[in-house]
């Protein structure tokens, strides 16, 4: 056919239906959609190889192998050309085998009696012995229409298959299944040689019409046993019996077409030097002749001693094959498989595909007549898997593919064993995750996630930051003692990982030099601290401070002459306002001596006591400066007595604390104060520090300069800081580009106890951060990034917390209350920190909350405005102004920006704003009462109470309640109508009569009391 062949055309050519071809293509691994689909040439060739060489079926008509109904003595003779051809056909021109399955096989020679064919009447017991086939392959075969006389109708149905105990005696009159058939003369058959018959390469013929279903119920009567003898009519075959016609498996290459006899190796002349008795030199196999054997896949395995199968079909004389019934054939199937000599199984089958030799219950695999081993059949039939042969392409089933796919998607099991600690101590940083915990105990993080979920009831991922409480509870659960590393220890470990250290003892080989003392001036607000420093420095810093109060930490170095020697002294000025507690604490930590300033006219105040506590906590000596001694009402002795209660005893009272009376305004006794500072430093302190090492110190203050960028005021504590050094301070790092002293002059290096302003940081350091010089910029950047990550993890752990029922309810309540969002911008980091702490301490009630969503140092930028617009926040600028077009953007976005220069003004305004956001509180105020004297029924209105106002005023549209016998009958009513006689009234005063309508409420009786009231707002305190 031209072009590609279609499935239905191939089915027509092969003589089978399209479903059979589609099924065969599917078995071959070729998936074709429908009968009208085209098939490629290689697939056609493979398909034809899988089918037997019967390219076309005979002309129409009833198949000759189907016996007619009735109980006649013998079956009807087959029609020429319609009988099935189970075996290879002879060469065209020679008479080929035409015996149908319903007729007996013609004897090929008198000395070679053949076995009964399937469906043929069995001969008498002497004649029922298996007869060998003809010894010569050149003997002419008999006519296809020759039928021997029927001797018994009982054997017409053939031997009934069925299991039989192994090793039992065979029934008389038939060959024992599984045993070799003896040749004539009683001699044992010779073993097959290498040139003997071998398994056939193709499966046996299969009927063209449905009928080989092994599960079809037979419609014919029960067949008699194979051991019965006698003559009788042949019983009709069951619906499942094989019918003649083409069978699956394409024609073999070179096979002739339909209609002519097929060439048979048995009909060819013997090869020279071959043995007599069979083609190829091998003696013919006993059991009669037969065509190609059915495929072993079409049979169910049978025990070795099973009953014999159905008799095989007749075949050309001289061909090895099954004349007798092959063991193990299922009823309704094809002929039995031929049993090879010496192999267990049934009797010689009528020929079939290459079944597995030696399989229990079946005959040996069919072999070709000529020498040489044939290919084993691989096609799986309806009765079992294919036989041994060349392995075909293996395809995974859909179930196997799905299981493989699902196994790939299967999540890793988290049920791994978690090691127990047995009291072992492990150290974890703040905000550590379960992955960090797992690294410490060498466990699977997924297992810890499961433990936290199942035993602690928390849903935490492996990389999520956990609170300290969660980590400690997990440690108790697993038997570990979890120690949360403090920030100081964590930072120390971080520096040690880079072979760095901060602080520590000096080595013996380190050269120490004298350094100036660091003096911190502390005290209550407005007690004259900055004015005293101005007197020492001969400057006027107070005039530059907004509101006359110090809001920054200032560091200065002055030179004082004591006993003729000029001694440098470093002064640090701290704010005295209560909001700058953190600044005072930092000032006390970095100082050598604390000068406590107390006003002689004001005495000891709260911030005075706080500053004293900071100094005592830092363990530094204290010098008391009693200021404002020139004012009226000054009492320095009172100050000495008050401070005695806090452990500061003056020298004149027998103590060790130096008290100096000074006047900062008049610059009185300033030299005495400096002398007291130097004497205290020399007596109590070892003022030496190394100068040849890398610089280390503390950042006192930080700010963002518009032209210079981040600027940090640092105090060098050891070593020498030089321009070009790589430094890291907290989460900020950079390279020193320039250094400025307190007067704004450029300096190239700064030794111990020298305060300088450093330019070159990438961001503004926080006040109080330690700074140190590192070998290179890369190390500084890595240290800063790790500190940022550590701080971020700690903040995340604190913000998340444990999701318990209480916290969920609290968050729901927070969602209901009003919140004020703020963005803080200041000139220096210390001021921003102080402002944030002060604002967060404001408490006006649970209904309103304060949230600071961002804070920073420097001018107000457009980014701050956009963030405030997105979060409905107010921008607070402390000593800063907008930058660029931030003002225009704020006006366009409707963002409110407030500017402050004094911190307590900002605190007061924010507190008032929070109070204004409180929800109003209402209380009930009684307006008046009216007594019901009469009840009138008004159409379309209802009952109207004719009343007398007893007290107050009755107003229309006010709330009312009805009281009967002192009991409230109805509440939350409304005075919908109010009339004075026939006129509508807005209000009726005491002593007047009126008509009151309460809307749809009509349960009004005489002597009831109508009380009116309203809700009035109560001012919040």
Swiss-Prot record:
Residues 523-530 are annotated as: G1. Residues 548-552 are annotated as: G2. Residues 50-422 are annotated as: Disordered. Residues 390-401 have a biased composition (Basic residues). Residues 627-630 are annotated as: G4. GO terms for cellular component: cytosol. GTP binds at residues 523-530, 573-577, 627-630. Residues 96-112, 130-159, 167-178, 187-196, 219-233 have a biased composition (Low complexity). The keyword Nucleotide-binding applies. Residues 663-665 are annotated as: G5. Residues 57-71, 275-291, 306-389 have a biased composition (Gly residues). Residues 514-686 form the tr-type G domain. Residues 573-576 are annotated as: G3. PROSITE patterns: G_TR_2, IF2. One of its GO terms (molecular function) is translation initiation factor activity. It is found in: Cytoplasm. Keywords: Cytoplasm, GTP-binding, Initiation factor, Nucleotide-binding, Protein biosynthesis. Belongs to the TRAFAC class translation factor GTPase superfamily. Classic translation factor GTPase family. IF-2 subfamily. One of the essential components for the initiation of protein synthesis. Protects formylmethionyl-tRNA from spontaneous hydrolysis and promotes its binding to the 30S ribosomal subunits. Also involved in the hydrolysis of GTP during the formation of the 70S ribosomal complex. PANTHER family: TR-TYPE G DOMAIN-CONTAINING PROTEIN (PTHR43381:SF5), TRANSLATION INITIATION FACTOR IF-2-RELATED (PTHR43381). This is Translation initiation factor IF-2. The gene is infB.
């Amino acid at each position: 056919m031209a072009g590609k062949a279609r499935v239905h055309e191939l089915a027509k050519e092969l003589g089978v239906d399209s479903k059979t071809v589609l099924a065969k293509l599917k078995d071959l691994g070729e998936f074709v959609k429908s009968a009208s689909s085209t098939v490629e040439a290689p697939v056609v060739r493979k398909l034809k190889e899988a089918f037997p060489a019967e390219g076309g079926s005979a002309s129409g008509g009833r198949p000759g192998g189907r016996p007619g109904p009735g109980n006649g003595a013998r079956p009807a003779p087959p029609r020429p050309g319609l009988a099935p051809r189970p075996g290879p056909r002879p060469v065209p021109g020679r008479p080929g085998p035409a015996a149908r399955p319903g007729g007996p096989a013609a004897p090929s020679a008198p000395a070679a009696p053949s076995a009964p064919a399937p469906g043929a009447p069995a001969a008498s017991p002497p004649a029922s012995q298996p007869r060998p086939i003809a010894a010569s392959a050149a003997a002419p075969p008999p006519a296809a229409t020759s039928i021997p006389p029927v001797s018994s109708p009982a054997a017409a149905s053939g031997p009934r298959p069925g299991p039989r105990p192994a090793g039992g005696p065979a029934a008389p009159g038939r060959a024992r299944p599984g045993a070799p058939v003896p040749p004539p003369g009683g001699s044992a058959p010779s073993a097959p040689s290498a040139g003997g018959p071998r398994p056939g390469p193709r499966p046996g013929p299969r009927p063209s019409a449905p009928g080989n279903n092994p599960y079809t119920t037979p419609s014919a009567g029960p067949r008699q046993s194979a051991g019965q003898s006698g003559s009788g009519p042949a019983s009709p075959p069951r619906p499942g019996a094989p019918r003649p016609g083409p069978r699956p498996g394409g024609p073999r290459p070179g096979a002739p077409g339909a209609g002519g006899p097929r060439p048979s190796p048995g009909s060819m002349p013997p090869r020279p030097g071959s043995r007599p008795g069979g083609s190829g030199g091998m003696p013919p196999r006993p059991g009669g002749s037969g065509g190609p054997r059915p495929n072993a896949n079409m049979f169910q395995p049978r025990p070795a001693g099973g009953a014999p199968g159905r008799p095989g079909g007749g075949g050309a004389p001289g061909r090895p094959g099954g004349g007798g019934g092959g063991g193990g054939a299922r009823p309704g199937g094809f002929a039995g498989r031929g049993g090879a000599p010496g192999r267990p199984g049934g009797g010689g089958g009528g020929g079939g595909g290459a079944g597995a030799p030696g399989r229990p219950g079946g005959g040996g695999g069919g072999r070709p007549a000529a020498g040489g081993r044939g290919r084993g059949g691989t096609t799986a039939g309806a009765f079992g898997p294919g036989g041994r042969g060349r392995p075909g392409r293996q395809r995974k089933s859909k179930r196997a593919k799905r299981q493989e796919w699902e196994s790939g998607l299967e999540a890793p099991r988290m049920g791994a064993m978690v090691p127990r600690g047995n009291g072992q101590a492990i150290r974890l940083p703040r905000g550590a995750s379960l992955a960090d915990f797992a690294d410490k105990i060498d466990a699977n993080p997924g297992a810890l996630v499961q433990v936290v979920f199942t035993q602690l009831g928390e849903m935490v991922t492996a990389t999520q930051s956990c609170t300290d409480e969660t980590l400690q509870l997990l440690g108790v659960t697993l038997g570990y003692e979890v120690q949360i590393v403090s920030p100081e220890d964590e930072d120390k470990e971080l520096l040690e990982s880079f072979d760095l250290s901060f602080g520590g003892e000096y080595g013996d080989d380190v050269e120490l030099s004298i350094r100036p003392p660091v003096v911190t001036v502390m005290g209550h607000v407005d007690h004259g601290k900055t004015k005293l420093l101005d007197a020492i420095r001969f400057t006027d810093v107070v005039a530059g401070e907004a509101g006359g109060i110090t809001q920054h930490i200032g560091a200065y170095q002055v030179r004082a002459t004591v006993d003729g020697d000029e001694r440098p002294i470093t002064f640090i000025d701290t704010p005295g306002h209560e909001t700058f507690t953190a600044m005072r604490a930092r000032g006390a930590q970095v100082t050598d001596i604390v000068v406590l300033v107390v006003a002689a006219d004001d005495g000891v105040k709260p911030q005075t006591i706080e500053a004293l506590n900071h100094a005592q906590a830092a363990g530094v000596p204290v010098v008391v400066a009693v200021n404002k001694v020139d004012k009226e009402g000054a009492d320095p002795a009172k100050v000495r007595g008050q401070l005695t209660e806090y452990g500061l005893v003056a020298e004149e009272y027998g103590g060790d604390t130096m008290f100096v009376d000074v006047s900062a305004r008049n610059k009185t006794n300033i030299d005495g104060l400096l002398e007291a500072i130097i004497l205290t430093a020399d007596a109590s302190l070892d003022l030496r520090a190394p100068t040849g090492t890398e610089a280390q110190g503390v950042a006192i203050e930080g700010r963002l300069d518009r032209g210079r960028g981040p600027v940090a005021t640092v105090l060098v504590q050891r070593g020498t800081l030089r321009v070009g050094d790589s430094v890291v301070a907290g989460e900020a790092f950079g390279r020193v580009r320039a250094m400025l002293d307190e007067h704004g002059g450029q300096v190239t290096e700064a030794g111990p106890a020298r305060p300088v302003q450093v330019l070159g940081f990438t961001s503004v350091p926080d006040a109080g951060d330690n700074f140190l010089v590192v070998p290179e910029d890369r190390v500084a950047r890595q240290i800063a990034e790790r500190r940022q990550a550590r701080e971020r993890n700690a903040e995340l752990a604190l913000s998340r917390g444990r999701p318990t029922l209480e916290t969920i309810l609290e968050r729901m309540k927070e969602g209901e209350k009003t919140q004020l969002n703020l963005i803080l911008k200041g000139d220096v980091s210390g001021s921003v920190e102080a402002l944030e702490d002060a604002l967060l301490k404001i408490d006006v009630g649970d209904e309103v909350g304060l949230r600071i969503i961002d804070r920073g140092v420097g001018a107000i930028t457009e980014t701050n405005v956009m963030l405030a617009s997105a979060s409905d926040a107010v921008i607070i600028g402390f000593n800063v102004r907008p930058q660029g077009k931030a003002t225009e953007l704020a006006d366009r976005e409707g963002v409110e920006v407030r500017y402050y220069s004094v911190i307590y003004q900002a605190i007061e305004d924010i507190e008032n704003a929070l109070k204004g956001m409180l929800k109003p509180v209402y209380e009930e105020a009684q307006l008046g009462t009216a007594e019901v004297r009469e009840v009138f029924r008004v159409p379309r209105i209802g009952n109207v109470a004719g009343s007398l106002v007893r007290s107050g005023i009755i107003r229309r549209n006010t709330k009312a309640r009805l009281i009967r016998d002192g009991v409230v009958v109805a509440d939350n009513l409304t005075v919908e109508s109010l009339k004075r006689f026939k006129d509508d009234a807005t209000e009726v005063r005491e002593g007047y009569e009126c008509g009151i309508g309460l809307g749809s409420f009509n349960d009004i009786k005489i002597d009831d009391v109508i009380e009116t009231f309203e809700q009035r707002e109560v001012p919040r305190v």
